[in-house]
């Protein structure tokens, strides 16, 4: 528990209140390894977690070229009948208006299916849109992690300096990065 609190303080964004450095936490981990407190996988996870501030969104994102997106004026019936297998594979799908590279939010596939079960076939995807967290491609993954946890969101869009989507980062991407 103590180590968990220390790591959280080290990775946290308020640098002015740090009373322990990353190096000190790393030294504690090394001692824990020597004394048999940590297993190899645990050590790797802790070390990866400590490096989250050095990893940026562009390094872990899923590139826009392979992200399934949906236009906000698409009907739920068209969504359901779409032959794009990716629309049926993911739980959260980014939504755009006219230009696919400018994401407005996302839709939960479960929300679409719920509305379809109530025979709302003519309803538009835009009626179900949820806000999406947006980060620049050079944002440290530690900041993304903190905000995703705070907002209880599992998806974020990564943009360039012009607001164009470069890709997405999901909670799963961050966790995989933390676990090494």
Regions found by a protein language model. Give the residues of each.
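Soluble cytosolic regulatory domains appended to membrane proteins
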Residues: 16-180
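Transmembrane helix-loop junctions in multipass membrane proteins, especially transporters and channels
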Residues: 9-17
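Hydrophobic alpha-helical segments of integral membrane proteins
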Residues: 1-10
């Amino acid at each position: 528990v103590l180590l968990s609190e220390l790591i959280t303080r080290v990775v946290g964004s308020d640098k002015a209140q740090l009373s322990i450095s990353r190096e000190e936490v790393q030294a504690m981990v090394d001692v824990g390894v020597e004394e048999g407190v940590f297993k190899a996988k645990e050590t790797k996870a802790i070390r990866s977690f400590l490096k989250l501030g050095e990893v940026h969104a562009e390094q872990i994102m899923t590139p826009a070229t392979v992200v399934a997106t949906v236009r906000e004026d698409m009907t739920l019936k068209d969504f359901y009948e779409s032959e794009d297998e990716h629309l049926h594979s993911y739980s959260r799908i980014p939504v755009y208006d006219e230009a696919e590279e400018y994401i407005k939010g996302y839709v939960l596939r479960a929300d679409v299916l719920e509305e379809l079960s109530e025979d709302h076939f003519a309803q538009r995807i835009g009626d179900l849109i949820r806000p999406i967290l947006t980060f620049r491609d050079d944002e440290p993954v530690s900041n993304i992690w903190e905000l995703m946890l705070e907002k209880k969101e599992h998806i974020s869009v990564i943009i360039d300096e012009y607001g164009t989507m470069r890709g997405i980062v999901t909670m799963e991407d961050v966790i995989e990065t933390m676990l090494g």
